[in-house]
């Protein structure tokens, strides 16, 4: 029986597993991929979100911005801030116009500078273009760094494994896992954390 089972071995899943292990909990980390850190953490999360792209959700943007400085400080060796980052507001198809973006950024205290450049942007198509402070990071260095730490802990891992069924009891979760060899594995945990991204609704159902 585990204190926590964490589903999804991307940045959030590994980070949560390490933090829980540090606090003395028995943790199992599972992922349907053969290797950890292969999906959204590389494809979608390879930049430090500060909230600029959430103008329709102030709560989400605020949370992103609040934690960005801590994230940058803890991972400074992997951060790339040597480039210019722009957000363009489409004149015809955007659900947010330039004035709304400015009000949103001002409300959150996000830095921006309205600007105008040529290629690769179509200035005829854009209502406004903003230069902002938002950095990227190297996801492969992240993976190497965190897996090195993970392998030194007591966190148990099961890759090529997915949840076939989950049953919530009074104080525990009972899970049936299946790996790529079609082996069935039955495990129990007190707490279940879903840190997937692309398959989050598939698991929640």
In which residue ranges do the predicted regions lie?
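Glycine-rich FAD pyrophosphate-binding loop
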Residues: 21-42
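N-terminal Rossmann-like FAD-binding beta1-loop-alpha1 element of flavoenzymes
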Residues: 2-28
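Hydrophobic anchor at the start of a short beta-strand
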Residues: 25-27, 112, 192
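Conserved Rossmann-like nucleotide-cofactor binding loop
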Residues: 12, 35, 199
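Active-site substrate-recognition segment that forms the wall
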Residues: 15-19, 48, 73, 77-82, ...
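Anion (oxyanion) recognition and catalysis
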Residues: 21, 106, 151
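Dinucleotide-binding Rossmann-like beta1-alpha1 core, especially the glycine-rich loop
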Residues: 45-120, 125-128
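Helical element adjacent to the flavin cofactor pocket in flavoenzyme catalytic cores
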Residues: 130-191, 195-202
